């Protein structure tokens, strides 16, 4: 599938039109960003790793009945996807307290939550992607109804159950992760974006070593090695 004009460039990917009106190509970038792009870096090979990791996870989820925008991986950095209109909500699911949750509510980092917590954030870089509730989402017309919000929550929880079990079998704790959804031309809500160490936190079950973008956020080093380790475990 040939790329045509670029539609959009985000922090981690570029999106391109194709000859098919309902399909786009997502090119995964080597760029690293943190703290709403206040911190920037680059890691050669990171884009290819995220593309392959996302491919494997989308395949897993599709096999479990989750509808996604994924069609196929084209090459090491490019993925063919269904065209969707992104819903401006970041759906964050948390299993272990860390990051902004610990800072915001004073929950000790590393505390296992008694239930999986699903949060909504308004997808707006200029505002810093603020946390919001259901009524905010409807007020801002992010969705058409409360039913659509419930679908996002239920799907996030279903994905969480699938991925927690999968990564547990690989010796990894799925600490938390961010999902994005979009609507296809028929109005169906599909899982979109990516699922990778850029959008998930993975901790080694034995050592609690961080194997995700926190290595960049916190200047821990060995970012590429961490992403490679996640991919190795997924494939083994």
From Swiss-Prot:
Reactions catalysed: 5-amino-1-(5-phospho-D-ribosyl)imidazole-4-carboxylate + L-aspartate + ATP = (2S)-2-[5-amino-1-(5-phospho-beta-D-ribosyl)imidazole-4-carboxamido]succinate + ADP + phosphate + 2 H(+)
Listed pathway(s): Purine metabolism; IMP biosynthesis via de novo pathway; 5-amino-1-(5-phospho-D-ribosyl)imidazole-4-carboxamide from 5-amino-1-(5-phospho-D-ribosyl)imidazole-4-carboxylate: step 1/2
Keywords: ATP-binding, Ligase, Nucleotide-binding, Purine biosynthesis
Signal peptide: none
GO biological process: 'de novo' IMP biosynthetic process; cobalamin biosynthetic process
Pfam family, one: SAICAR_synt
Family annotation (InterPro entries): SAICAR_synt/ADE2_N, SAICAR_synt_PurC, SAICAR_synth, SAICAR_synthetase, SAICAR_synthetase_CS
Cystine crosslinks: none
Domain of life: Bacteria
A molecular-function term among this protein's GO annotations: ATP binding
EC numbers, comma separated: 6.3.2.6
Family: Belongs to the SAICAR synthetase family.
Entry-linked PANTHER family: MULTIFUNCTIONAL PROTEIN ADE2 (PTHR43599), SI:DKEY-6E2.2 (PTHR43599:SF3)
NCBIfam families assigned: purC
Protein name: Phosphoribosylaminoimidazole-succinocarboxamide synthase
Species annotation: Wolinella succinogenes (strain ATCC 29543 / DSM 1740 / CCUG 13145 / JCM 31913 / LMG 7466 / NCTC 11488 / FDC 602W) (Vibrio succinogenes)
Gene: purC
